[in-house]
Protein backbone atom coordinates (compact mmCIF):
# COMPACT_ATOMS: atom_id res chain seq x y z
CA UNK A 1 0.00 0.00 0.00
CA UNK A 2 1.51 3.34 -1.06
CA UNK A 3 1.35 6.57 0.93
CA UNK A 4 -1.63 7.89 -1.01
CA UNK A 5 -3.58 4.69 -0.38
CA UNK A 6 -2.77 4.81 3.32
CA UNK A 7 -3.91 8.43 3.51
CA UNK A 8 -7.15 7.52 1.75
CA UNK A 9 -7.74 4.60 4.11
CA UNK A 10 -7.07 6.81 7.13
CA UNK A 11 -9.48 9.45 5.86
CA UNK A 12 -12.20 6.82 5.51
CA UNK A 13 -11.68 5.26 8.95
CA UNK A 14 -14.63 5.50 11.32
CA UNK A 15 -14.14 6.36 14.98
CA UNK A 16 -16.37 5.52 17.92
CA UNK A 17 -18.15 8.82 18.46
CA UNK A 18 -19.50 9.33 21.99
CA UNK A 19 -20.83 12.84 21.32
CA UNK A 20 -23.97 13.87 23.20
CA UNK A 21 -25.36 15.46 20.06
CA UNK A 22 -25.22 15.79 17.16
CA UNK A 23 -24.37 12.17 17.61
CA UNK A 24 -23.43 8.91 15.96
CA UNK A 25 -25.65 7.60 13.18
CA UNK A 26 -25.91 3.98 12.02
CA UNK A 27 -23.29 3.25 9.36
CA UNK A 28 -25.95 1.58 7.20
CA UNK A 29 -27.94 4.80 7.20
CA UNK A 30 -24.95 6.92 6.21
CA UNK A 31 -24.10 4.50 3.42
CA UNK A 32 -27.64 4.58 2.05
CA UNK A 33 -27.72 8.37 2.23
CA UNK A 34 -24.41 8.45 0.33
CA UNK A 35 -25.73 6.11 -2.35
CA UNK A 36 -28.85 8.24 -2.80
CA UNK A 37 -27.13 11.61 -2.52
CA UNK A 38 -27.19 12.50 -6.21
CA UNK A 39 -30.34 10.66 -7.23
CA UNK A 40 -32.95 9.46 -4.77
CA UNK A 41 -34.46 6.20 -6.07
CA UNK A 42 -33.82 7.10 -9.69
CA UNK A 43 -35.48 10.51 -9.48
CA UNK A 44 -32.40 12.32 -10.77
CA UNK A 45 -32.54 14.61 -7.72
CA UNK A 46 -30.98 14.70 -4.30
CA UNK A 47 -33.51 14.88 -1.48
CA UNK A 48 -31.93 18.24 -0.65
CA UNK A 49 -33.09 19.54 -4.04
CA UNK A 50 -36.66 18.30 -3.94
CA UNK A 51 -39.72 20.45 -3.54
CA UNK A 52 -41.27 19.64 -0.20
CA UNK A 53 -44.63 19.51 -1.99
CA UNK A 54 -43.46 17.22 -4.76
CA UNK A 55 -44.68 13.63 -4.83
CA UNK A 56 -41.16 12.30 -4.15
CA UNK A 57 -40.72 14.10 -0.85
CA UNK A 58 -44.35 13.63 0.12
CA UNK A 59 -43.74 9.87 -0.06
CA UNK A 60 -40.61 10.22 2.13
CA UNK A 61 -42.56 12.25 4.68
CA UNK A 62 -45.52 9.87 4.74
CA UNK A 63 -43.27 6.86 5.26
CA UNK A 64 -41.40 8.59 8.10
CA UNK A 65 -44.67 9.42 9.86
CA UNK A 66 -45.94 5.86 9.46
CA UNK A 67 -42.71 4.23 10.64
CA UNK A 68 -42.42 6.44 13.71
CA UNK A 69 -46.03 5.75 14.66
CA UNK A 70 -45.41 2.02 14.31
CA UNK A 71 -42.12 2.01 16.24
CA UNK A 72 -43.52 3.87 19.24
CA UNK A 73 -47.02 2.36 18.98
CA UNK A 74 -48.43 5.90 18.92
CA UNK A 75 -52.22 5.76 19.47
CA UNK A 76 -54.56 7.13 16.81
CA UNK A 77 -55.65 9.98 19.08
CA UNK A 78 -52.13 11.44 19.03
CA UNK A 79 -50.76 13.72 16.32
CA UNK A 80 -47.15 13.46 15.14
CA UNK A 81 -45.60 16.77 14.11
CA UNK A 82 -42.29 17.46 12.38
CA UNK A 83 -41.07 20.91 13.40
CA UNK A 84 -37.90 22.97 13.71
CA UNK A 85 -36.17 24.89 16.48
CA UNK A 86 -35.09 22.02 18.71
CA UNK A 87 -36.10 21.31 22.28
CA UNK A 88 -34.89 24.77 23.28
CA UNK A 89 -37.60 26.31 21.10
CA UNK A 90 -40.14 23.86 22.53
CA UNK A 91 -39.39 25.30 25.97
CA UNK A 92 -41.38 28.29 24.74
CA UNK A 93 -43.65 26.48 22.29
CA UNK A 94 -45.04 24.11 24.96
CA UNK A 95 -46.35 26.88 27.25
CA UNK A 96 -47.49 28.92 24.25
CA UNK A 97 -49.65 25.96 23.16
CA UNK A 98 -50.77 24.60 26.53
CA UNK A 99 -50.42 26.94 29.47
CA UNK A 100 -53.73 28.73 28.84
CA UNK A 101 -55.59 25.43 28.51
CA UNK A 102 -57.36 25.76 31.88
CA UNK A 103 -57.24 29.49 32.49
CA UNK A 104 -56.80 32.45 30.17
CA UNK A 105 -56.29 34.85 33.07
CA UNK A 106 -54.03 32.78 35.32
CA UNK A 107 -52.03 30.32 33.19
CA UNK A 108 -50.01 27.90 35.28
CA UNK A 109 -47.87 24.79 34.90
CA UNK A 110 -45.94 22.39 37.13
CA UNK A 111 -42.28 21.62 36.41
CA UNK A 112 -40.13 18.86 37.87
CA UNK A 113 -36.48 19.92 37.82
CA UNK A 114 -33.91 17.14 37.54
CA UNK A 115 -31.03 18.71 35.62
CA UNK A 116 -29.80 21.41 33.29
CA UNK A 117 -32.44 20.97 30.63
CA UNK A 118 -35.44 21.04 32.94
CA UNK A 119 -33.94 24.13 34.61
CA UNK A 120 -33.92 25.83 31.20
CA UNK A 121 -37.45 24.63 30.48
CA UNK A 122 -38.96 26.16 33.62
CA UNK A 123 -37.01 29.39 33.17
CA UNK A 124 -38.44 29.88 29.69
CA UNK A 125 -41.97 28.93 30.76
CA UNK A 126 -42.02 31.72 33.35
CA UNK A 127 -42.35 34.22 30.51
CA UNK A 128 -45.85 32.90 29.78
CA UNK A 129 -47.41 32.22 33.15
CA UNK A 130 -46.92 30.95 36.67
CA UNK A 131 -44.53 28.06 37.18
CA UNK A 132 -44.76 25.81 40.21
CA UNK A 133 -41.64 23.76 40.90
CA UNK A 134 -43.33 20.54 41.95
CA UNK A 135 -40.02 18.89 42.80
CA UNK A 136 -36.32 19.57 42.36
CA UNK A 137 -33.12 17.65 43.00
CA UNK A 138 -30.89 20.69 42.59
CA UNK A 139 -29.91 20.60 46.28
CA UNK A 140 -28.52 17.11 45.63
CA UNK A 141 -26.61 18.33 42.55
CA UNK A 142 -29.14 16.46 40.40
CA UNK A 143 -27.67 13.11 41.40
CA UNK A 144 -31.11 11.50 41.73
CA UNK A 145 -34.74 12.01 40.67
CA UNK A 146 -37.04 13.11 43.52
CA UNK A 147 -39.43 10.41 44.67
CA UNK A 148 -42.81 10.88 42.99
CA UNK A 149 -44.60 10.59 46.33
CA UNK A 150 -42.95 13.85 47.41
CA UNK A 151 -43.93 15.89 44.35
CA UNK A 152 -46.14 18.90 45.15
CA UNK A 153 -48.41 18.99 42.13
CA UNK A 154 -50.98 21.73 41.59
CA UNK A 155 -54.66 21.06 41.00
CA UNK A 156 -54.89 24.03 38.63
CA UNK A 157 -51.80 23.37 36.49
CA UNK A 158 -52.42 23.08 32.75
CA UNK A 159 -49.68 20.47 32.51
CA UNK A 160 -46.78 18.83 34.32
CA UNK A 161 -43.43 19.07 32.56
CA UNK A 162 -40.59 16.54 32.89
CA UNK A 163 -37.27 15.96 31.18
CA UNK A 164 -37.14 12.18 31.23
CA UNK A 165 -33.44 11.90 30.34
CA UNK A 166 -31.05 14.65 31.38
CA UNK A 167 -28.21 14.50 28.88
CA UNK A 168 -25.70 16.53 30.88
CA UNK A 169 -25.96 15.08 34.37
CA UNK A 170 -26.97 11.59 33.25
CA UNK A 171 -30.22 10.85 35.07
CA UNK A 172 -33.16 9.03 33.49
CA UNK A 173 -36.64 8.05 34.63
CA UNK A 174 -36.57 4.25 34.68
CA UNK A 175 -40.36 4.06 35.07
CA UNK A 176 -43.19 6.28 33.88
CA UNK A 177 -44.37 8.41 36.84
CA UNK A 178 -47.90 7.45 37.85
CA UNK A 179 -49.33 10.95 37.58
CA UNK A 180 -50.82 10.99 34.08
CA UNK A 181 -54.20 10.29 32.48
CA UNK A 182 -55.44 8.12 35.35
CA UNK A 183 -55.11 11.19 37.57
CA UNK A 184 -56.52 13.64 35.04
CA UNK A 185 -53.19 15.36 34.46
CA UNK A 186 -51.51 16.34 31.21
CA UNK A 187 -47.88 15.21 31.36
CA UNK A 188 -45.42 16.74 28.90
CA UNK A 189 -41.94 15.26 28.52
CA UNK A 190 -38.74 16.32 26.81
CA UNK A 191 -37.45 13.00 25.46
CA UNK A 192 -34.74 14.40 23.18
CA UNK A 193 -31.93 12.14 24.30
CA UNK A 194 -33.69 8.81 24.76
CA UNK A 195 -36.58 8.76 22.31
CA UNK A 196 -36.76 5.38 20.53
CA UNK A 197 -34.41 3.79 23.08
CA UNK A 198 -37.31 2.22 25.01
CA UNK A 199 -41.08 1.76 24.57
CA UNK A 200 -43.47 4.52 25.64
CA UNK A 201 -46.34 4.07 28.11
CA UNK A 202 -48.90 6.34 26.47
CA UNK A 203 -51.12 6.26 29.54
CA UNK A 204 -48.46 8.33 31.24
CA UNK A 205 -47.83 11.03 28.64
CA UNK A 206 -49.98 13.50 26.75
CA UNK A 207 -47.14 15.22 24.87
CA UNK A 208 -43.62 14.10 24.00
CA UNK A 209 -41.12 16.32 22.24
CA UNK A 210 -37.47 16.26 21.33
CA UNK A 211 -34.73 17.36 19.00
CA UNK A 212 -33.67 14.63 16.59
CA UNK A 213 -29.92 15.23 16.76
CA UNK A 214 -29.21 12.89 19.66
CA UNK A 215 -30.94 9.58 19.02
CA UNK A 216 -32.63 9.92 15.64
CA UNK A 217 -30.81 11.89 12.96
CA UNK A 218 -29.03 15.11 12.06
CA UNK A 219 -29.76 18.45 13.67
CA UNK A 220 -32.65 20.48 12.28
CA UNK A 221 -35.68 18.30 12.98
CA UNK A 222 -37.84 18.52 16.09
CA UNK A 223 -40.50 15.91 16.80
CA UNK A 224 -43.68 16.58 18.78
CA UNK A 225 -46.22 13.86 19.56
CA UNK A 226 -49.32 15.41 21.13
CA UNK A 227 -52.76 14.19 22.09
CA UNK A 228 -55.20 15.63 19.57
CA UNK A 229 -57.60 17.03 22.15
CA UNK A 230 -54.80 19.32 23.39
CA UNK A 231 -54.44 21.13 20.08
CA UNK A 232 -56.22 24.45 19.79
CA UNK A 233 -55.24 26.20 23.04
CA UNK A 234 -52.41 28.31 21.65
CA UNK A 235 -51.71 31.80 22.94
CA UNK A 236 -52.82 34.47 20.44
CA UNK A 237 -49.19 35.59 20.15
CA UNK A 238 -47.88 32.08 19.43
CA UNK A 239 -46.08 32.17 16.06
CA UNK A 240 -48.19 30.42 13.44
CA UNK A 241 -45.35 28.09 12.47
CA UNK A 242 -45.25 26.85 16.08
CA UNK A 243 -49.01 26.60 16.63
CA UNK A 244 -49.47 22.85 16.95
CA UNK A 245 -53.04 22.92 15.61
CA UNK A 246 -52.02 24.82 12.47
CA UNK A 247 -49.00 22.59 11.93
CA UNK A 248 -51.17 19.48 12.28
CA UNK A 249 -53.83 20.82 9.91
CA UNK A 250 -51.12 21.42 7.32
CA UNK A 251 -49.45 18.04 7.63
CA UNK A 252 -46.30 19.55 9.16
CA UNK A 253 -45.90 21.67 6.03
CA UNK A 254 -47.21 25.00 7.26
CA UNK A 255 -43.73 26.19 6.33
CA UNK A 256 -40.96 24.36 4.49
CA UNK A 257 -39.95 21.43 6.71
CA UNK A 258 -36.32 20.36 7.24
CA UNK A 259 -36.48 17.97 4.31
CA UNK A 260 -33.08 16.30 4.48
CA UNK A 261 -33.23 15.85 8.25
CA UNK A 262 -36.64 14.17 7.83
CA UNK A 263 -35.24 11.93 5.10
CA UNK A 264 -32.33 10.77 7.29
CA UNK A 265 -34.65 10.31 10.27
CA UNK A 266 -36.81 8.13 8.05
CA UNK A 267 -33.80 5.99 7.17
CA UNK A 268 -33.06 5.62 10.89
CA UNK A 269 -36.66 4.55 11.56
CA UNK A 270 -36.28 1.84 8.91
CA UNK A 271 -32.93 0.79 10.42
CA UNK A 272 -34.58 0.43 13.84
CA UNK A 273 -37.26 -1.78 12.32
CA UNK A 274 -34.54 -3.99 10.82
CA UNK A 275 -32.93 -4.29 14.27
CA UNK A 276 -36.16 -5.72 15.66
CA UNK A 277 -37.82 -2.50 16.81
CA UNK A 278 -37.60 -0.39 19.94
CA UNK A 279 -37.93 -3.37 22.27
CA UNK A 280 -34.86 -5.02 20.74
CA UNK A 281 -32.88 -1.80 21.01
CA UNK A 282 -33.88 -1.42 24.65
CA UNK A 283 -32.42 -4.85 25.41
CA UNK A 284 -29.21 -3.89 23.62
CA UNK A 285 -29.05 -0.54 25.42
CA UNK A 286 -29.41 -2.19 28.82
CA UNK A 287 -26.45 -4.46 28.03
CA UNK A 288 -24.26 -1.57 26.86
CA UNK A 289 -25.05 0.63 29.86
CA UNK A 290 -24.57 -2.19 32.36
CA UNK A 291 -21.18 -3.03 30.90
CA UNK A 292 -19.93 0.52 31.32
CA UNK A 293 -21.46 1.20 34.75
CA UNK A 294 -20.27 -2.15 36.11
CA UNK A 295 -16.71 -1.38 35.07
CA UNK A 296 -16.82 2.13 36.56
CA UNK A 297 -18.29 0.87 39.84
CA UNK A 298 -15.67 -1.86 40.17
CA UNK A 299 -12.84 0.57 39.53
CA UNK A 300 -11.13 2.63 42.17
CA UNK A 301 -9.88 4.93 39.44
CA UNK A 302 -13.19 6.13 37.95
CA UNK A 303 -16.51 7.04 39.51
CA UNK A 304 -20.10 7.89 38.58
CA UNK A 305 -22.02 10.01 41.11
CA UNK A 306 -25.60 9.28 39.97
CA UNK A 307 -27.84 7.16 42.19
CA UNK A 308 -28.10 3.68 40.62
CA UNK A 309 -31.92 3.89 40.55
CA UNK A 310 -31.89 6.63 37.94
CA UNK A 311 -28.71 6.27 35.93
CA UNK A 312 -29.14 7.08 32.27
CA UNK A 313 -28.74 4.32 29.72
CA UNK A 314 -27.89 6.88 27.07
CA UNK A 315 -25.51 9.35 28.74
CA UNK A 316 -22.90 8.08 31.18
CA UNK A 317 -20.87 10.78 32.96
CA UNK A 318 -17.80 9.65 34.85
CA UNK A 319 -14.83 11.19 36.58
CA UNK A 320 -11.20 10.27 37.06
CA UNK A 321 -10.36 10.40 40.75
CA UNK A 322 -7.16 12.17 39.72
CA UNK A 323 -8.47 14.95 37.48
CA UNK A 324 -4.95 16.05 36.57
CA UNK A 325 -4.99 13.10 34.16
CA UNK A 326 -8.09 14.28 32.26
CA UNK A 327 -6.26 15.72 29.26
CA UNK A 328 -4.05 12.66 28.94
CA UNK A 329 -7.14 10.45 29.06
CA UNK A 330 -8.84 12.38 26.27
CA UNK A 331 -5.72 12.52 24.10
CA UNK A 332 -4.99 8.82 24.43
CA UNK A 333 -8.64 7.93 23.87
CA UNK A 334 -8.68 9.95 20.68
CA UNK A 335 -5.54 8.19 19.49
CA UNK A 336 -7.46 4.93 19.93
CA UNK A 337 -10.41 6.20 17.87
CA UNK A 338 -12.61 7.03 20.88
CA UNK A 339 -13.78 10.62 20.50
CA UNK A 340 -16.08 13.25 22.05
CA UNK A 341 -15.65 11.95 25.60
CA UNK A 342 -15.14 15.28 27.34
CA UNK A 343 -17.89 16.05 29.86
CA UNK A 344 -20.12 19.09 29.61
CA UNK A 345 -18.41 22.28 30.74
CA UNK A 346 -20.93 22.74 33.57
CA UNK A 347 -20.13 19.33 35.05
CA UNK A 348 -16.60 18.47 33.99
CA UNK A 349 -15.07 15.03 33.84
CA UNK A 350 -16.03 12.68 31.03
CA UNK A 351 -19.25 11.61 29.39
CA UNK A 352 -19.93 8.68 27.10
CA UNK A 353 -23.16 9.00 25.14
CA UNK A 354 -24.11 5.51 24.00
CA UNK A 355 -27.21 6.07 21.92
CA UNK A 356 -29.02 3.48 19.79
CA UNK A 357 -26.48 3.76 16.97
CA UNK A 358 -23.46 3.10 19.22
CA UNK A 359 -22.60 -0.58 18.70
CA UNK A 360 -21.72 -2.86 21.58
CA UNK A 361 -18.20 -3.03 20.14
CA UNK A 362 -17.81 0.69 20.77
CA UNK A 363 -18.59 0.31 24.46
CA UNK A 364 -16.29 -2.70 24.67
CA UNK A 365 -13.50 -0.66 23.10
CA UNK A 366 -14.09 2.17 25.58
CA UNK A 367 -14.01 -0.17 28.58
CA UNK A 368 -10.84 -1.85 27.29
CA UNK A 369 -9.18 1.55 26.90
CA UNK A 370 -10.30 2.71 30.34
CA UNK A 371 -8.92 -0.46 31.89
CA UNK A 372 -5.56 -0.03 30.15
CA UNK A 373 -5.37 3.68 31.01
CA UNK A 374 -5.98 2.84 34.67
CA UNK A 375 -3.28 0.15 34.57
CA UNK A 376 -0.63 2.40 33.06
CA UNK A 377 -1.53 5.32 35.32
CA UNK A 378 -1.09 3.26 38.48
From Swiss-Prot:
InterPro entries: Aminotrans_V_dom, Pser_aminoTfrase, PyrdxlP-dep_Trfase, PyrdxlP-dep_Trfase_major, PyrdxlP-dep_Trfase_small. One of its GO terms (biological process) is pyridoxine biosynthetic process. GO terms for molecular function: O-phospho-L-serine:2-oxoglutarate aminotransferase activity; pyridoxal phosphate binding. It comes from the Bacteria. Its cofactor is pyridoxal 5'-phosphate. Pathway: Amino-acid biosynthesis; L-serine biosynthesis; L-serine from 3-phospho-D-glycerate: step 2/3; Cofactor biosynthesis; pyridoxine 5'-phosphate biosynthesis; pyridoxine 5'-phosphate from D-erythrose 4-phosphate: step 3/5. Gene3D superfamilies: Aspartate Aminotransferase, domain 1 (3.90.1150.10), Type I PLP-dependent aspartate aminotransferase-like (Major domain) (3.40.640.10). Pyridoxal 5'-phosphate binds at residues 117, 167, 190, 213, 255-256. Homodimer. This is Phosphoserine aminotransferase.
Amino acid sequence: MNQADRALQASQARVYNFSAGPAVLPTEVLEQAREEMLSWQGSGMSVMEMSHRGREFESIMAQAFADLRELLAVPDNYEILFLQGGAIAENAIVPLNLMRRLSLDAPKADYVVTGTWSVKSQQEARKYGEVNIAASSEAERFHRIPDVSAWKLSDDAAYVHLCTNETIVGVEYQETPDIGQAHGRVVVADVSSHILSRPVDWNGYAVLYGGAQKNIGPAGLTIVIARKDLLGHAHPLCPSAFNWRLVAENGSMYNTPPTYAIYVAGLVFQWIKRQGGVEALETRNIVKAKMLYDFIDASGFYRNDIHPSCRSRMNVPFFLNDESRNEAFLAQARAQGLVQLKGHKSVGGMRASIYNAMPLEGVEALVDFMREFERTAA
